[in-house]
Amino acid sequence: VAQPIIIIKENQALVELTTRDLSFINERNLSRIFHEVAEAGLEIHLMQTSAVTFSMVVDHKPERITHLEKTLSQEFIYEEKTSLRLITVRHATPAMLERFRAEHAIWFEQTSDVTTKLLVLASEE
């Protein structure tokens, strides 16, 4: 049985981009978003796509995030939430995940086979 590994990234930002005309997020939209993320020198730590919204978690680097807002706000409704912490747990036990969920208000959660990522307010302990 693998031992749990916990990685905590402080000072994270959640950026949500919603199509202005409520059309679906498609490959063209994603290509544009990824291009601007690369131009800004940001790395996406967590992402999710819904029908009309693309959400991503990046390091909160104001000058770089401002670039995203300036370049993407014409095409998308831009929303940003800061003061967040990203907790990544590999090989978590069910009890460990329950404890994290009980101790934090979860803004965003993503689970794969062996990894769970939880986005929480940084002020929470």
Question: Where do the language-model regions lie?
Answer:
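A conserved regulatory-domain signal marking ACT and ACT-like small-molecule sensing domains
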Residues: 1-125
